[in-house]
Amino acid sequence: MCIRDRLKPSEKSPLSAIRLGELALEAGLPPGALQILPGFGQTAGAALAAHLDVDCIAFTGSTATGKSVMQAAAQSNLKRVSLECGGKSPNIVMADFDDLDRVARTAAYAIFFNQGEMCSAGSRLLVQESIREPLLELSLIHI
């Protein structure tokens, strides 16, 4: 039996996963043990979910896509599936916080850490209206 890990990153942010593959090789992981498969979910992701030689799928993303992954897994070889679907945690920012640059910097880090693929990624900011514009300007700098 040959166990390999295949990683299909989000098509919106594949570079960190590609770099992870490079680092794995540099660290001594045998070639082919970790395969990075960039591509679109509707093609590359669907092919992985339906492939008979894939025994397990772990998916993080939308609820609609999670349902498709589960269906493809069930219709192929009834592979094990782990889903993290839906919600992302918002950050709430009130006007009495005095360091908006820190908020912008931290929010930019939080959303892109781990390619944003976790339920606590903080992909939304709920901001008191009086600080909306200055925080938006600072956020654009840090993204």
Predicted regions and their residues:
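Hydrophobic/aromatic residues within well-ordered alpha-helical segments
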Residues: 13-16, 40, 131, 135
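A structured beta-alpha segment of the ubiquitous adenosine-cofactor-binding alpha/beta core
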Residues: 36-55
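ALDH superfamily catalytic-core signature
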Residues: 28, 50-51, 56, 63-141
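Short beta->alpha connector loops at strand-helix junctions that form conserved
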Residues: 8-10, 38, 60, 94-95
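Conserved small/polar residues in nucleotide/adenosyl-binding loops
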Residues: 1-5, 141-143
